[in-house]
């Protein structure tokens, strides 16, 4: 009788723990960073790059990730080891991902290793909102379609031509187009020149609306930065 009571208590505690886990997951982040990167700035660094097995990507910004983040600058990661990347769940998105979310890491790959990393590190932490892999990757693709950075910049006469542009003009061009302030991340080319690398745009915790970023990442750019060719 005592053993049955103990087992029942164990089950109750297990259920309570699981419920609390679900509640905590729902509160595990405050907003998303949606990050796009310029391939020319990835490839002209000292570490260089490798084109994916599908060939050289288009000269366009590519998705880096959709990352849950907290207002204090911390972020959750690797939240659900029971939800490994499963490409069969996103088979209808692969063609679009190869175009809009290409890998440039070496050695050359199809993109699956990159996408697996993004899902398992970041996507699993958004399951309370974007409930499965298809929803997560589709949301990122939809945001890419919504925020056409290259067209925005070219419309402001800012082109990937290897020339330098004022950082404030790049930031203002994007803000004028989307209504919110982006964060510009720079890296340096092989000659040590500061260049446009990644653009961070913030999305609310439901994944439905762009917002002003509650906090920006660290790092800084020069007042004038290159926009390299690709």
From Swiss-Prot:
Entry EC no(s): 4.6.1.19
GO CC term, one of those recorded: extracellular region
Keywords: Cell wall, Disulfide bond, Endonuclease, Hydrolase, Lyase, Nuclease, Secreted, Signal, Stress response
Coiled-coil annotated residue ranges, if any: none
Induction record: By phosphate starvation.
Pfam families associated with the record: Ribonuclease_T2 (PF00445)
Disulphide bridges: 43-49, 50-106, 79-125, 186-221, 202-213
Signal sequence range: 1-25
GO biological process, one term: RNA catabolic process
InterPro entries named among the record's database cross-references: Ribonuclease_T2_eukaryotic, RNase_T2-like, RNase_T2-like_sf, RNase_T2_His_AS_1, RNase_T2_His_AS_2
Superkingdom of the organism of origin: Eukaryota
Binding site for RNA: 37, 64, 114, 117-118, 121-122
Active-site residues annotated for this sequence: 64 (proton donor), 118, 122 (proton acceptor)
Localization annotation: Secreted, Extracellular space; Secreted, Cell wall
GO MF annotations, alphabetized: ribonuclease T2 activity; RNA binding; RNA endonuclease activity
Enzyme class (EC, first level): lyase
Reactions catalysed, as given in the entry: a ribonucleotidyl-ribonucleotide-RNA + H2O = a 3'-end 3'-phospho-ribonucleotide-RNA + a 5'-end dephospho-ribonucleoside-RNA + H(+)
PANTHER family named in the record: RIBONUCLEASE 1, RIBONUCLEASE T2
Family named by the database record: Belongs to the RNase T2 family.
Function comment: Probably involved in plant phosphate-starvation rescue system.
Annotated protein name in UniProt: Extracellular ribonuclease LE
Organism: Solanum lycopersicum
